[in-house]
Design a protein with these regions (language model features):
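Bacterial N-terminal signal peptides that target proteins for export
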Residues: 3-21
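Carbohydrate-interacting regions of secretory-pathway proteins
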Residues: 31-212
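Divalent metal-dependent hydrolysis catalytic cores, especially in the metallo-beta-lactamase
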Residues: 228-234, 243-267, 287-293, 316-319
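Short beta->alpha connector loops
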Residues: 82, 235-240, 292-299
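N-terminal, post-signal-peptide region of Sec/Tat-exported proteins
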Residues: 55-81, 85, 242-277
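Bacterial Sec-dependent signal peptides at the C-terminal "C-region" and cleavage site
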Residues: 19, 23-36
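Extended substrate/RNA-proximal surfaces in nucleic-acid metabolism proteins
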Residues: 270-323
Length: 323
């Protein structure tokens, strides 16, 4: 696999200097009842306490929410500016826990919105800069689900023996606070709310067995923020776009799913511009890269540049030329 991109923007962790503030905020908030929707509106900004469900963070600013959470469902909306990035941390004490990335824009090797940082990194954004988009983060037992708008982009089950590098040694589930951290530019949030889930809550849709990370190579790349992308996936042999979606989330591999434009290929075939646009409408909101493979010799004349230009990338090979 070629390293086409370099993630050159590592994000520091919150740091132990604010761990005491997290504990202080947790003490201010009652445990709450499972199933009760709570506005996430009490934050500590350094030494200052603020009340809002619409916070914004800029580079170097961290907001710590009151409360301690185990199983939960957190919902809200986010707005990114071009080049801006922020993180939502959970199960954190200032050093531990996971983070969800908020960053949009072109496919350029940076981690995109919905990434479970350094565990399930995503490289194609389903949201746009300058537009509000919904998100949801749910923790049930050992399972973490992240949604961008209505699309599930991460479904990760922490195995019994998770692999973590020294830098991510405390990137583990447990319980703890929620935090927002600015990385660069400004990211705004609104309508933040959190629902406590019972201790026995489980994701019934999580039917695939957890990956054994003691022997898994993908998690080793993910922990080092090395882009793990398979650009050449075809929908054939029983592989549907829905199954590709599930497999991508389970194995931690970003799939580039490509139909065949032209003649002579195997799998999903596109015959003209109309079929190109119809296919792209099907997959545009799915969390994988959208490529297209030119087949045969006629595809450059059969399809317009405008139609092929809707895809993230185009490639061809000489293995199945029939004309």
């Amino acid at each position: 696999m070629r390293n086409l991109f370099c993630h050159s923007n590592p994000v520091p962790r919150i740091g132990t200097t604010i761990a005491a503030a997290l504990l202080s905020l947790a003490a201010l908030t009652a445990c709450g009842e499972a199933g009760a929707l709570e506005p996430l509106d009490r934050w500590r900004d350094g030494e200052r306490e603020i009340r809002t469900t619409a916070p914004a963070v800029t580079a170097g600013r961290t907001l710590l929410a009151a409360g301690d959470y185990g199983n939960f469902r957190l919902t809200g909306e986010a707005l990114t500016q071009p080049g801006a990035q922020a993180a939502l941390l959970f199960h954190t004490d200032g050093e531990s826990g996971y983070e969800v990335v908020f960053r949009n824009g072109a496919i350029d090797g940076t981690r995109k919105s919905g990434s479970l940082a350094s565990v399930r990194n995503l490289y194609r954004s389903l949201a746009d800069d300058g537009e509000w988009f919904g998100f949801e983060v749910t923790v049930r037992g050992r399972n973490i689900v992240v949604r961008i708008d209505t699309t599930e982009v991460v479904c990760y089950t922490e195995p019994e023996h998770p692999y973590r590098t020294q830098a991510h040694a405390r990137q583990l589930l447990g319980h703890g606070a929620i935090a927002l951290r600015g990385v660069q530019g400004e990211v705004a949030f609104r309508n933040l709310a959190i629902e406590r889930l019972g201790a026995q809550a489980r994701n019934e849709a999580d039917t695939l067995p957890p990956v054994d990370e003691r022997t898994d190579g993908v998690i080793r790349f993910q922990q080092r923020d090395f882009p793990v992308i398979d650009y050449h996936v075809h929908l054939k042999g029983g592989l549907t776009k829905e199954r590709a979606h599930a497999m991508s989330m389970n194995y931690g591999i970003n799939y580039g799913v490509a139909p065949n434009a032209g003649e002579g290929g195997v799998g999903r075939m596109l015959a003209d511009d109309g079929e190109v646009y119809a296919y792209f409408d099907e997959v545009e909101r799915m969390p994988f890269l959208c490529g297209v493979q030119g087949e045969g010799r006629k595809w450059t004349a059969t399809f317009s540049q405008e139609a092929l230009g809707v895809f993230d990338y185009l490639f061809t090979d000489a293995m199945t030329i029939i004309d």
